[in-house]
Amino acid sequence: MHNIFKGLITALITPFKDNKLDLYALERIVKHQIKHEVDAVLIAGSTGESSSLSFEEYKLLLQTSVEIVNKCIPIISGCSSNNTTYARALAAESTKIGVDGFMASPPSYVKPTQHGIYKHFEALHEVCNLPIMLYSAPTRSGVDFSDETILRLSKLPRILALKDCGVDLERPLRIRATVKKDFNILTGNDEVVLAFNAQGGVGWTSVASNIVPNICKELLEKWNKNDTKGALEIHQKLLPLYTALFVESNPIPIKYAAHYLGLCENEIRPPLTEASDSAKKQIENIITSLSIKI
C-alpha cells in the first residue's frame, strides 16, 4: 500500500459563516494549498475544529473537499473520537466518500489503557481499507501511545505512520529502530520540524502552512536536499510566526491569520473564542514583517 503520510501535510482550518460551513471559503483555502503543491491536506483534525462538527457537517466537509481537490493531492480525514463506535462510523464514511487515508488519536477524556488504545485502533483498522496515521497528541487526548503500543499497531498492515505532537525528540529514533521500514514518523509541531526530521522523521503536519504553504514547502525541500543552512535560515525566519500561531489555543490564532489574509471569516465555534486583541496584534505584526500574502 502506498504511504501518503510524508512530506508537507497541511492541517487545514474549517471555515464557518453564520455558524454553517462556508464552502466558498473552503474552496479558496484548499485551492491555495493545491497551488503551492503541498503533499497532502488533513481535513477535520484538531486545527479543523472537528469536535464541533455534526456528522452531517463532517460528511459535507469531506465531500466538498474531495470535489475541490479532484485527485490533485491526497486528502486525509480526521477520525478521532472517544467513542469507538462513532470513530468507526467516521472511518467508514471517509472510505465511502473517497478520501485517501485517515488519522486518529487515542480516545480522549476516558483514559483507556494501552490495551484499550490498541483495541480502538484495531476496530478502526477492521472497518475500512484506507491507510491510517496514528495521532499522538497527549496534551489534547490525556493519554498517549507507549512505544510498545506503536510497535504493535505498526504490525497491522494499513497502519503506516505516526503524527507526533509530543516534545520527546528521542522518540522518533526509538520508534524507527523497531518498526517496519515503511512506517513513517512525522512531527505535528511546526517549531521542531528540523530537529524532529534529523532524528528520523520524514515529514511535517503543519498549522503554519495554512497561510505560508510555499515557504513551508521550500523549507522541507531544502532539508531533503541536504541544504541544512538554507532550511535553517527559513526556519529561523518562521519561528516568530510559529510562536504567534500558538499564543492562544490552536486554531484560534491561525483562524484569525487566515481571516486577516482574506481566506475566511474569523468565526470559531464555542467553547473556543476569537483571538484576543493582543494576539491579533501579534499575528498582524508578524504577517506584515514577513510580507505574507495570499
UniProtKB/Swiss-Prot annotation:
Annotated function: Catalyzes the condensation of (S)-aspartate-beta-semialdehyde [(S)-ASA] and pyruvate to 4-hydroxy-tetrahydrodipicolinate (HTPA).
PROSITE patterns in alphabetical order: DHDPS_1, DHDPS_2
GO CC term (a single one): cytoplasm
Subcellular location: Cytoplasm
Designated name of the protein: 4-hydroxy-tetrahydrodipicolinate synthase
Residues at the active site: Y135 (proton donor/acceptor), K163 (schiff-base intermediate with substrate)
Membrane-spanning parts: none
Binding site for pyruvate: T47, T205
InterPro entries assigned: Aldolase_TIM, DapA, DapA-like, Schiff_base-form_aldolases_AS, Schiff_base-form_aldolases_CS
EC number: 4.3.3.7
Gene Ontology annotations of biological process type: diaminopimelate biosynthetic process; glyoxylate catabolic process; lysine biosynthetic process via diaminopimelate
Pathway(s) it belongs to: Amino-acid biosynthesis; L-lysine biosynthesis via DAP pathway; (S)-tetrahydrodipicolinate from L-aspartate: step 3/4
Reaction equation(s) it catalyzes: L-aspartate 4-semialdehyde + pyruvate = (2S,4S)-4-hydroxy-2,3,4,5-tetrahydrodipicolinate + H2O + H(+)
Primary location recorded for the protein, binned into one broad class: cytoplasm
